[in-house]
Amino acid sequence: MESQQLSNYPNISHGSACASVTSKEVHTNQDPLDVSASKIQEYDKASTKANSQQTTTPASSAVPENLHHASPQPASVPPPQNGPYPQQCMMTQNQANPSGWSFYGHPSMIPYTPYQMSPMYFPPGPQSQFPQYPSSVGTPLSTPSPESGNTFTDSSSADSDMTSTKKYVRPPPMLTSPNDFPNWVKTYIKFLQNSNLGGIIPTVNGKPVRQITDDELTFLYNTFQIFAPSQFLPTWVKDILSVDYTDIMKILSKSIEKMQSDTQEANDIVTLANLQYNGSTPADAFETKVTNIIDRLNNNGIHINNKVACQLIMRGLSGEYKFLRYTRHRHLNMTVAELFLDIHAIYEEQQGSRNSKPNYRRNPSDEKNDSRSYTNTTKPKVIARNPQKTNNSKSKTARAHNVSTSNNSPSTDNDSISKSTTEPIQLNNKHDLHLGQKLTESTVNHTNHSDDELPGHLLLDSGASRTLIRSAHHIHSASSNPDINVVDAQKRNIPINAIGDLQFHFQDNTKTSIKVLHTPNIAYDLLSLNELAAVDITACFTKNVLERSDGTVLAPIVKYGDFYWVSKKYLLPSNISVPTINNVHTSESTRKYPYPFIHRMLAHANAQTIRYSLKNNTITYFNESDVDWSSAIDYQCPDCLIGKSTKHRHIKGSRLKYQNSYEPFQYLHTDIFGPVHNLPKSAPSYFISFTDETTKFRWVYPLHDRREDSILDVFTTILAFIKNQFQASVLVIQMDRGSEYTNRTLHKFLEKNGITPCYTTTADSRAHGVAERLNRTLLDDCRTQLQCSGLPNHLWFSAIEFSTIVRNSLASPKSKKSARQHAGLAGLDISTLLPFGQPVIVNDHNPNSKIHPRGIPGYALHPSRNSYGYIIYLPSLKKTVDTTNYVILQGKESRLDQFNYDALTFDEDLNRLTASYQSFIASNEIQQSDDLNIESDHDFQSDIELHPEQPRNVLSKAVSPTDSTPPSTHTEDSKRVSKTNIRAPREVDPNISESNILPSKKRSSTPQISNIESTGSGGMHKLNVPLLAPMSQSNTHESSHASKSKDFRHSDSYSENETNHTNVPISSTGGTNNKTVPQISDQETEKRIIHRSPSIDASPPENNSSHNIVPIKTPTTVSEQNTEESIIADLPLPDLPPESPTEFPDPFKELPPINSHQTNSSLGGIGDSNAYTTINSKKRSLEDNETEIKVSRDTWNTKNMRSLEPPRSKKRIHLIAAVKAVKSIKPIRTTLRYDEAITYNKDIKEKEKYIEAYHKEVNQLLKMNTWDTDKYYDRKEIDPKRVINSMFIFNRKRDGTHKARFVARGDIQHPDTYDSGMQSNTVHHYALMTSLSLALDNNYYITQLDISSAYLYADIKEELYIRPPPHLGMNDKLIRLKKSLYGLKQSGANWYETIKSYLIKQCGMEEVRGWSCVFKNSQVTICLFVDDMILFSKDLNANKKIITTLKKQYDTKIINLGESDNEIQYDILGLEIKYQRGKYMKLGMENSLTEKIPKLNVPLNPKGRKLSAPGQPGLYIDQDELEIDEDEYKEKVHEMQKLIGLASYVGYKFRFDLLYYINTLAQHILFPSRQVLDMTYELIQFMWDTRDKQLIWHKNKPTEPDNKLVAISDASYGNQPYYKSQIGNIYLLNGKVIGGKSTKASLTCTSTTEAEIHAISESVPLLNNLSHLVQELNKKPITKGLLTDSKSTISIIISNNEEKFRNRFFGTKAMRLRDEVSGNHLHVCYIETKKNIADVMTKPLPIKTFKLLTNKWIH
């Protein structure tokens, strides 16, 4: 057909592809891609095959036949006349032109016509002069069919001059995709080469061999347009053509570059994988070749680690280097550099360098001795390597040598052994190991083989031709001086002392003997398999036995490490008593002790120490001469190498070459410090430092995180700074291998800027010493500055920056210059510098009013980077400013002449001083103050974790509570205090006495309050005494905050929870003469304790009566009074003995000693040990002052610094970060897998029960039509994300039944296979407890049901497939689910919707709004928990009717119908309930705890004295840093999870009295210290001792017309870390405890009143929800009550005054609480602290108090 088509073109007078080429042209036009014939595409190969059938090249051709060209044929057919190209487009070939040009037209005749629309390719039209495809031809260069015989003859006269001609050139294929362009370019280049245009193709360097002509360029342009349509070109090609649409050469050049890069990577990988080295080339050249390849691959993103590189190198070693292949078995961490050290050592020995270098080789492994033999084809060879190295050796490379070779002696000739070096000796006994031993200094006695990998065994060696043994004990028929030459792998001689027989007695009672050689110079005893084979014994490594050819097993083989061993117990000992080898006898007394023996004897000390000790006779019994020191020089103790392993030593002055090689700012060191925890969000948590290698100039930058973009911004900033300010370019940056430095983003940035990253080696921080030392220095300075200034820790980076400025200006002792001078900068002008933390007054340029003060006190931090100002911290505004408008606050001394820091008083609490607020002292006095505060996000309780501050004993002796201070003393001391302001230090000076910490005598008038009523004992005691009483020495450890100056802001309401008795001197109302109140007795003082709440005032201003200073809600009607009395009447409160109104409990009787760890987590709180009174400090004390010494704020205010916020001091608390927010407890697996329950279960009876349960579950699954049984799917056909794994789980229930369940692995389910919005609801525990309580009060019947395989009743909407369990033998198949299988994410929600719909539609139930899974109708209440149902009804028939309806649809089992009138026992959701209708209900978990607690492996004391309380008051948890390894830490955390998990389960079920202890310990799950574990054990022990306790409910009195729902709240102020308070609530329904909660307050409270408000506000939402539930389930009216023991809180709730709140957070909370109380008709009542049962939720109590508060509701 092709011949016919071509015959239609008569106008073509030339052959279509008949150009020839000379041999010279063939060789010069070389392919730059070097594409071999094997790499040609399939269509090229097909073309080759087709062309090979045509006429071959004439024999006269000087060039071998080119399979890509066709030979010219005689012109037997006229040329075609009607071709697509006119005759004038053809060129006459008068030279070696490209083959087949006639198809593409004469290039000179085609003009360079630009594209009409854009410089892109468009298909040419029929009138275009550009070539087109012939419409009837498949390709533009179709080859004529061989059968047609139609050929074309080249008419060019130049063809006769050619030595060879080409066949028809096959064109490239059409480009069909941009992704195929790289492969297409290869074929296009091949096409150009075959067309005699190889010379114009760009070479590797991007330049062609010759210049392209215009004709060739036209041809190139036309052919590229034909075969590469524009729509299939890559973007980068289109970009080139958009600039110059004829620039095909640039496209080819760039394509070749891309292919060269890809080819180079492929070639490097192939070269690296096929490395070969045998020593024929220099080792340096081989190393350079390999390292260059690895570097190129690493730079191209192909990372080759040391392990892979070493394996590839060792795989190619041969000859003398072959043994290095096996080093990887003993040295897993070998680097490429270490491997090349071994290769260099062997190469040097081959080159004859033994005379100039020590005759030993580097040991491939410094950790183990190894002995292994390899087969040699020429002579027997035994490899024996026993690397030894002295401890004090300075050699960098230790090389393998056999033990008998001296360190400096030349190697022995391989062919013979010098007999002169061997002197025979007599064998004294059969245990003598010196049989024929050479008496040379290099001899080492191996009497002790404790270094063997497997002592008492022989190493099986397939490569050893002889058996060698070190001990003569098993040698039979021994003879000395054998004429045997044995060499090791390095062809060094191994001296042989004797030869004999080795006799075996195997376990089948057969005896065998082989020849054995004796030498003490090997590491292991070698048993040659070749010699065993000679006596018909082979080693079977599949069975690991020695056996005969007939299969008889002789002995087992032990695999230890990488080798196989046979026990020596099969060897027969020698029966030669005293054989005489020669007539030479060595006396026992002349034998020297071997050094290895002495080395081990003397605790592995080094040789130098041992020799020195022997010389000085510090070791007796033998002398230095009694030890053989010959091997001490090169001895390497394996135990020392392992036990004393250290990092490589850094050579002193090793960085001098960098300092000399680089100019300033060309070599930088950088490192990151952080994070610093417990800081506000606005403060940085990290900083990154930079140090210049040459000048030592330093920079620091703050960081809030370590993200890639944050690090990149800093690098961009510093590089631009160095470039612009110092006109330098950074060349190298040294850093560690942290992810912030090794990420791809930073790597590309450095590469783009031409910077070389220099990383440290793994775990080698010393190599990064410059940056590490800088960070350490800056942190030391930071701690010092913060300690000295007393500034808050969130300013820590300002201290770092201040230190950096100073350090850059200090001269180095070595260079005698500062970093600034090295950098060419001027010295630091100290007149512009202020001490860090210098008090200043800053001008307020924008005051609130014209009469507002213009000055704001602040603290100077450091000079500004961006201006000539100074960075100053303003505590009152809680921000820093950059300003020059400041005045230094100076004392008598200059700021530069030892500024007197002690002239300033620094208080601890920033929030209270700066917050201006309205407060009142009495109902008729309210004082206003200006407020300079602006709210910010600073958390001023944050702390920098730098180093622990050790507590100090402040007072040398305890202060007697009966001592007092005379008034005169106060006056004198007050005068002294007024002269010098005292700064409250972090650690109080032990020299401070009681007198000089008293407040100043000079005070402004303080109003005197009379008729103050105390509520210390729960009653009202009128105190007609002044507010401020004199201070006695007994209270010197308390704060003197009660006395205030003009602004008496801190006098607030008073409650009973106070122990800080404040007795200080006061001023009269109208004058300046101070008078003190006469002293009163301790008893009177205790009566007159006045309790203050510093932040929320509890006194109502609208009532001036002295009887209502602490208001309680006064009933206005008799009904209200009766309501409040009725709320408290039926509660299970303790019965207290009546007390006399004049008696007051001594608050100091059970007060624990002052503890320095008062801010740590406590199971006792801060002073919470009083049995009757909650002893909570109302004011925060200095954290580091264990005696709570406080300085009056008037001392601070004496210098008009009332608005200045004194910095606070805090002590670091060592906590793991995760401890601070433990949100959940990891569940503990209680089920068994299939293999555990059935396959490997050794308990036959249990196994049978599990098998029975398994078959029952399978039948149930098939019965429920869980999956599609008609079709099984191939795993390859299904989308993997729709495939869910499955498994069987087994467990034994509490009733003893064995359960099997087929579940899906929902934990690895893909998110696309379920709706995350669906919810799986279960009944809330409070709903269950409420239903049970109402059932008791209303004589309900309780029926318990269970629905079998509940989830399987719910259909599944999604298309999901599961893998059958592995034991079913269907590994490659899948089954499609139809039902909601257990374990799927959506199964619970599907079942909930299914059962909910059925209960509503079929059973006539409705779900209670707001309480999921609680359904009701007029007669029945249902609580649903997955497949468990609990029915409550007054009529049992109503329950039965529901059961009948359920059985119509579901397999419903009746667990307990509840029809008996006697006591009925239930097991409902883990609770063991005893219920007698109309009388009582008891809830417990005795059986469950009896079963579970012993399985926790807790050291119980079952027969010892039982614990009476779960914890001790006053006990604090020490939170020092844990020093345990990772495995032990994980083990202890896992143990804590189990223990606290069980305790939480029990506590929230019914043991509400344990919730405080559980909550406190749960916060320390990730801090499992010994103390925490002991406390946890104590809690579990108490649970064990009281496992029989039950929550007791009694039926409500029938006379009660209403339901009463009560919440009792309590709070323990500031007894948790970071001043957090513990809050607790107990909920009661009709006098029955139904729930409880104990938790740490989310907000930081500043007083007990705020804590109580927080506690009550937390209880109200749940109280309202429970109220709604009770009203839905029982239509009786409901009375709701809130009980608290804080009268100040009640006063705030019932008051309408909005000026009481100084804090907007608690003000908002209190205002909302007011609205909720009034809107929900809540009755707020007062309860005495001694009767507040919620007290157990907030603090540990003494045994007596704990029992008193709990014995009425749980016993």
From Swiss-Prot:
One of its GO terms (biological process) is DNA recombination. A motif (Bipartite nuclear localization signal) lies at residues 1178-1212. Residues 1338-1476 form the Reverse transcriptase Ty1/copia-type domain. Initially, virus-like particles (VLPs) are composed of the structural unprocessed proteins Gag and Gag-Pol, and also contain the host initiator methionine tRNA (tRNA(i)-Met) which serves as a primer for minus-strand DNA synthesis, and a dimer of genomic Ty RNA. Processing of the polyproteins occurs within the particle and proceeds by an ordered pathway, called maturation. First, the protease (PR) is released by autocatalytic cleavage of the Gag-Pol polyprotein yielding capsid protein p45 and a Pol-p154 precursor protein. Coiled coil: none annotated. It is found in: Cytoplasm; Nucleus. Mg(2+) 1 binds at residues 671, 736. The C-terminal RNA-binding region of CA is sufficient for all its nucleocapsid-like chaperone activities. This is Transposon Ty1-ML1 Gag-Pol polyprotein. It comes from Saccharomyces cerevisiae (strain ATCC 204508 / S288c).
